[in-house]
Amino acid sequence: MKKSLLTIVLAFSFVLGGAALAPTVSEAHGYVASPGSRAFFGSSAGGNLNTNVGRAQWEPQSIEAPKNTFITGKLASAGVSGFEPLDEQTATRWHKTNITTGPLDITWNLTAQHRTASWDYYITKNGWNPNQPLDIKNFDKIASIDGKQEVPNKVVKQTINIPTDRKGYHVIYAVWGIGDTVNAFYQAIDVNIQ
């Protein structure tokens, strides 16, 4: 009896100790806070301006998939289970941030820092259809910033340039390419260019 009780106590201690060492949701990764991404605006930190966003409600920082995961119709979720609601696409579905052409400051909040290969930014082309699923062929790459394989700060501020020929509703697609893994983090940002 004593041996069984000791086995149970040791097993329980091992489980609790292992759980304490396991990474938590708050420790994983990064999201675009300004201008806010779909995922960020679906979280309490973003004011829940977007609703029915799946896992993004609790973990906007966790849209992580292999680099160059540009799945037609699944750009916003990067095909990650639980984030599929972010892939819904209509002209009115998402909260939009008003911006202007020219320099645009982007702020990433990193809940876990990783060596960085690059920060890449895309924007929808003129004439894209906001009522069709997002497709990388309908985006132009507008910036690539070398991460120099360095570990960034927890708050990363960068400036990109929004082309002067863009007006109205567009989507900016931000990709944080990790330097020491095969993965990247993906964020769709809905903007109204004035």
Swiss-Prot record:
Q: Where are the transmembrane segments?
A: none
Query: Which coenzymes or cofactors are required?
Result: Cu(2+)
Write down how the cofactor binds this protein: The copper metal center seems to be reduced from a Cu(II) to Cu(I) oxidation state prior to binding of dioxygen for catalysis.
Coarse class of the protein's main subcellular location? secreted
Which Pfam families does its entry note? LPMO_10
Q: Where is the Chitin-binding type-4 domain?
A: 29-191
Subcellular location, in the record's words? Answer: Secreted
- GO biological process, alphabetically ordered: chitin catabolic process; polysaccharide catabolic process
Keywords for the protein's UniProt record, in alphabetical order = Carbohydrate metabolism, Chitin degradation, Chitin-binding, Copper, Metal-binding, Oxidoreductase, Polysaccharide degradation, Secreted, Signal
Q: Where does Cu cation bind?
A: H29, H114
Q: What is the top-level taxon of the source organism?
A: Bacteria
Q: In which pathway does it act?
A: Glycan degradation; chitin degradation
Reaction equation(s) it catalyzes:
[(1->4)-N-acetyl-beta-D-glucosaminyl]n+m + reduced acceptor + O2 = [(1->4)-N-acetyl-beta-D-glucosaminyl]m-1-(1->4)-2-(acetylamino)-2-deoxy-D-glucono-1,5-lactone + [(1->4)-N-acetyl-beta-D-glucosaminyl]n + acceptor + H2O
Keyword Secreted on entry: yes
Instruction: Briefly state the protein's biological role.
Output: Involved in chitin degradation. Catalyzes the oxidative cleavage of glycosidic bonds in both alpha- and beta-chitin via a copper-dependent mechanism, leading to oxidized chitooligosaccharides with a dominance of even-numbered products. Acts synergistically with the chitinase EfChi18A, and combining the two enzymes leads to rapid and complete depolymerization of crystalline chitin, especially with beta-chitin as a substrate. Is likely involved in a chitin degradation pathway that allows E.faecalis V583 to grow on chitin as a carbon source.
Protein name, UniProt field: Lytic chitin monooxygenase
Species annotation: Enterococcus faecalis (strain ATCC 700802 / V583)
